[in-house]
């Protein structure tokens, strides 16, 4: 009996020790992580967990018994909630989600790095610039779309595309690559060139660029679908060039990379195009992953801003998903529809593009759709592909589920487990270099008590406010007289996000001065437009 009890206790002790060791291994090193020199944050727009799972099966080699891992499987560390500010409920749009990732602040749907009171809040890229780092964005949408705009600028509505484009003159970003020619007039481009930017409209010219600053506008709006130009690998090419250019700064860099069109394909409920966009994004991640291996001072964080489309791998109660159908498709349904409308004998071209021959009944349905024009035929082709692959969708909009977080490099363990999307921003901002302090001024001789009384009596409220702002500037900005990208006020949470003792002390002193009676000045107004007006096709 005693032996049995002793054995049980020993087994229990061994289990507890084993569990403790397992937890330690799971959580990683308990010592504080090292601070990276460079940060790359990559956003798969609309890339919910179903997309990464579907991509795994899409990439699976059917000739092997094993299902091969993808870059997403290798780098997975956690997940994140995505809800916006309470005024917008539980389901976010891209602008509010990007604001959370860029600033650590929840806001209303449609807002571009302004809070719910429409006041600008400082972004990761702005703070990096203030610390002497280089910054850049590479995207497959227009560069003034919701996600890149939230990292670069501020506006009460994501729909103010022209205003956002103009505001980029003040960002001082070193690299901006994507689409958006439509929103940059010749006059505006001339202003960028006057500020030293090389402005390109042909992606092939990127090879000749050897230094920042560069702005690439490679399409009227978004870049072409990856499925229609699979050899272009534009996001990988732009990302590699951005890394090359930004790494010229010894102070480090912060780069945003977005696979923008995953979301657009999801809104269209277009599984074939979505998987091609996932492949494009995965290729760009692998470019950065390789860079991280070669530059061990670089942190990579990958996530999504939200889920799009309610993608379902299998539907109608049938336990099947045929990825082989998708791998054979060599053009987007939009492109297939255009070609079918341009030809009298269209059936052969459709079969060739789909990689399979529709049945007579399916051809009859497509023919009826063709009679109604390109949009109806495109929808018919997408439904046919969904039926053949057994893919399901629940919406043409966004859903409110959590998204995955992937990371590699120094401090990547910070992103393990569950977190909110604002936590990702807080962690990234805390990893930026410490703000450069201004040189201390020589202390003045202390006046006598009578003189102090006179000074206290005559000091006005505006002077107290000026002292507070001067103190903030001297503690936060790189140079004593440097002008911040936006007005930085205590309610922006800039200081608490930095997690710097000196900065917190500066905030406390500034707030004490402000409490003497000075009122904060309001920030400059942003363009007026309905903040909730955003079409699904480009959310």
What is the predicted role of each segment?
Residues 2-22:
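Gram-negative bacterial Sec-dependent N-terminal signal peptides
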Residues 24-31:
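Cleaved targeting-peptide boundary
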